[in-house]
Curated annotation (Swiss-Prot):
Recorded coiled-coil stretches: none
Positions contributing to substrate binding: 10, 42, 75, 89
GO MF: ATP binding; pantetheine-phosphate adenylyltransferase activity
EC number: 2.7.7.3
Cellular localisation: Cytoplasm
Official protein name in the record: Phosphopantetheine adenylyltransferase
Assembly and interaction partners: Homohexamer.
GO BP term, example: coenzyme A biosynthetic process
Taxonomy of the source species: Bacteria, Pseudomonadati, Chlorobiota, Chlorobiia, Chlorobiales
Main localization category: cytoplasm
Keywords, comma-separated and alphabetical: ATP-binding, Coenzyme A biosynthesis, Cytoplasm, Magnesium, Nucleotide-binding, Nucleotidyltransferase, Transferase
InterPro entries reported for this sequence: Cyt_trans-like (IPR004821), PPAT (IPR001980), Rossmann-like_a/b/a_fold (IPR014729)
Amino acid sequence: MSKKAIYPGTFDPFTNGHLDVLERALNIFEHVDVVLAENSQKQTLFSVEERFDMVREVVRDLPNVSVDVLREGLLADYARQAGASAIVRGVRQVKDFEYEFQMSLLNRHLYPEVTTVFLMPNVKYTYVASTIIREVSMLGGDVSKFVHPYVLDQLSRKRAERRAH
């Protein structure tokens, strides 16, 4: 069995909490693919290309990490094609676990060889969610402790674009 995992998410934007979960996954797996989901049900601040660029910049110095985009299809099929033995999911609170548990059971049904691994971030990131980071940043709040400097620059750029319109 492969020691490769995939870490899927919308990552709008990629936060230090996401990075913490990724680093924890790298302590378990030989290789982790960060897979950006192009989710039509979510209205994102950043395009999938912008999110890909941000994640790639944040993880560029991490060994054994690659970044990809799942534009269509099932995550279980992507995991199978990538040769992944695990799907990594970050869980901050019970509310997260309920949804992730359902998804893990469905993915196991679709691809029985894959295991979902739930990882909790450092306690200092348990309240950090991309949605909150976006909202606070767009309102001019300081989110510098919660995102990589490159992501902070991209959030500032988006805020300036919105003000210009």
